[in-house]
Amino acid sequence: MIYEDKFIRVEREENELPWVKIFTAKPYRELSKCDEASRARLYEAMLVAEKAMLEFYKPTKINIASFGNYVPHVHIHVIARFENDAFFPDSVWASTKRKSELRLPKFDE
């Protein structure tokens, strides 16, 4: 766990890519069911994570995703992507295209 407050929690996804998941504190199944304060905090945290990754890692692109098919709890994935990552330009859930050659600064929680 990286961060938690009464509206959200932020977790690091175990992956070679810089990747965080931001969950609502309450187990809402759909974004439209979230209370306004939780939804606002979720988006605020998403933007903070995106800006921090852009500044720290200098990625080619930031991917932002929300599915919830396997984990039916509102959450957003924020993932820094690089031209030389194993999946680029495809989704991180696709098959790998190459061996990754990432050399990234170390991130400590």
What does each of the following model-derived ranges do?
Residues 1-109:
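HIT superfamily nucleotide-processing domains
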